[in-house]
Regions:
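Catalytic core of nucleotide-sugar-dependent glycosyltransferases
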Residues: 150, 192-193, 216-224, 229-259, ...
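Glycine-rich, basic loop-to-helix element that forms the pyrophosphate-binding segment
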Residues: 67-84, 106
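Short aromatic/hydrophobic "clamp" motif used to bind/position activated sugar donors
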Residues: 89
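Conserved nucleotide-sugar donor-binding catalytic segment
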Residues: 140-234
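Conserved donor NDP-sugar-binding/catalytic core segment of glycosyltransferases
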Residues: 102-137
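Short, well-formed alpha-helical segments that are part of the catalytic scaffolds
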Residues: 14-27
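A conserved acidic beta->alpha catalytic loop
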Residues: 40-49, 69, 93
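Membrane-interface aromatic/basic loop that binds lipid-linked glycans or pyrophosphate carriers
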Residues: 2, 273-337
C-alpha cells in the first residue's frame, strides 16, 4: 500500500466549510504518510471547485473523486474506501473539522503497538455554526483506554443521539472493512440504510478491542440541516426509520435480543409516531405500524395513547392545537427569561 493512512472526506453542498475541513487534515503531524480521498457527491454549489483547487495544490496527498450523479452518503463512503490505499482509514465529514494536529499520530501509534485493537476513537466537542462556539459532548459509555469490542455492540445498536463511537474521530484497520465488503457487501451498502457509521462501528467492535483517547480531536458541526438532522418532519421520519432498520439488521446479525434492544425499538416506534403526529400524515402512521411489526417492538403505554389519539381525526387535530399552544408558551417563556 502506498500510504499508511487514508482519510475519507465526503462532501455535498458544503462550500462554506469544506476548506476548513481539508485544512484541519492537512495540518496533521504524523510519522507515517497519509492521503485524503474526497468523495464529492455532485454538489450544486461551489464545493467541487474548492476541492479541485485543493487537489491541484496538494497533488501528492489529495485524490478527488467527483461523482457524476449523487450517490448518497452510504455508497459514496464505501466507494471511497475501495479507492483508498491506506492500511488504516479515518474520515472527516465536509462540515466537521479536526482540532488536534497530533490526532492521527496518537491513533496510529496505538494501532501499531496493539495488534488486537481494531479501531481507535477519541473525545470530541460540538461546534455551533451560528455563534462559532464549542461545547463538550455528552458523556461517553466506554472511556477505558481499551475495551473488549463485543461489550460495545449492544450499545452501538441502541445508540440514539450520541454515538458510542464518533467515526469522524476514529482510525481503523482497512483490512477488516475490505474483507467484510468483499464477503457481505449488502450488509453495508443496502439502499435503504441512512448512514455508514453504525455498520462500521459494529464490525470493528466484533473483530477485536476498541481503544479510546480522552483528548478532544474533533469539532462536530451543529446548527444547520444535515443528513441526520432536519426540521422537516418527513425527512427526519425517513432518516430515523432507515437508521433504526440498520440497527435491527445489526442486532439480528450479531444475535442480540435483550431488554435494552427491546426498549430501543419500542422508543423508536414512538418517535416515528410523533413525527407522523406532528406532520398530520396518515401514510407515515401506516409506515410506523409496519415498522413496529417488522422490528417486533413492544408497544409502550405512551405509544398506545398516541396511536389512540391518531386513530380519531378530531382527537388528532385537537392534539395538534394543544401542542401548538404549548410550543408558543415555551417560546414566550424563553424570551422572558
Amino acid at each position: 500500500m502506498e500510504n499508511k493512512i487514508s482519510v475519507i472526506v465526503l462532501t455535498f453542498n458544503q462550500e462554506d466549510t469544506i476548506g476548513r475541513t481539508l485544512d484541519s487534515i492537512l495540518m496533521q503531524r504524523c510519522h507515517v504518510p497519509y492521503e485524503i480521498v474526497i468523495g464529492e457527491d455532485c454538489s450544486t454549489d461551489g464545493t467541487l471547485d474548492i476541492c479541485r483547487q485543493y487537489e491541484r495544490k496538494h497533488p501528492g496527498i489529495i485524490r478527488l473523486f467527483a461523482n457524476k450523479k449523487n450517490k448518497g452518503v452510504v455508497d459514496n463512503y464505501f466507494d471511497c474506501i475501495l479507492e483508498s490505499h491506506g492500511q488504516y482509514i479515518a474520515d472527516c465529514a465536509g462540515d466537521d473539522f479536526w482540532t488536534d494536529p497530533l490526532k492521527l499520530e496518537k491513533e496510529v501509534s496505538i494501532l501499531e503497538n496493539n495488534p488486537n485493537v481494531t479501531l481507535v476513537h477519541t473525545n470530541w466537542e460540538s461546534y455551533n455554526e451560528q455563534d462559532k462556539s464549542s461545547h463538550a459532548s455528552p458523556d461517553k459509555p466506554f472511556t477505558a483506554p481499551i475495551t473488549q469490542g463485543y461489550q460495545m455492540i449492544e450499545a452501538i445498536i441502541t445508540q440514539r443521539k450520541v454515538p458510542v463511537i464518533q467515526l469522524c474521530t476514529s482510525l481503523y484497520r482497512s483490512s477488516i472493512i475490505l474483507k467484510a465488503l468483499s464477503e457481505e457487501e449488502s450488509s453495508f451498502r443496502d439502499k435503504s440504510f441512512g448512514c455508514e457509521d453504525l455498520q462500521v462501528a459494529a464490525l470493528m467492535a466484533s473483530h477485536g478491542d476498541i481503544a479510546y483517547i480522552p483528548d478532544v480531536t474533533l469539532n462536530y458541526s451543529e446548527g444547520g440541516e444535515t443528513v441526520s438532522y432536519s426540521l422537516d418532519h418527513h425527512k427526519q421520519f425517513s432518516f430515523v426509520k432507515r437508521v433504526t432498520y440498520q440497527s435491527f439488521l445489526i442486532a439480528q446479525h450479531y444475535h442480540i435480543n435483550s431488554p435494552a434492544t427491546d426498549r430501543f425499538f419500542s422508543q423508536r416506534v414512538f418517535e416515528l409516531g410523533m413525527f407522523a403526529f406532528r406532520a398530520h400524515d396518515r401514510q407515515m402512521l401506516a409506515e410506523t405500524f409496519q415498522c413496529e411489526k417488522d422490528w417486533q417492538a413492544t408497544r409502550a403505554t405512551k405509544t398506545r395513547w398516541l396511536f389512540t389519539v391518531m386513530r380519531h381525526e378530531v382527537l388528532w387535530r385537537t392534539g395538534l392545537i394543544v401542542r401548538q399552544v404549548f410550543v408558543k408558551i415555551k417560546q414566550l417563556h424563553r424570551q422572558l427569561v
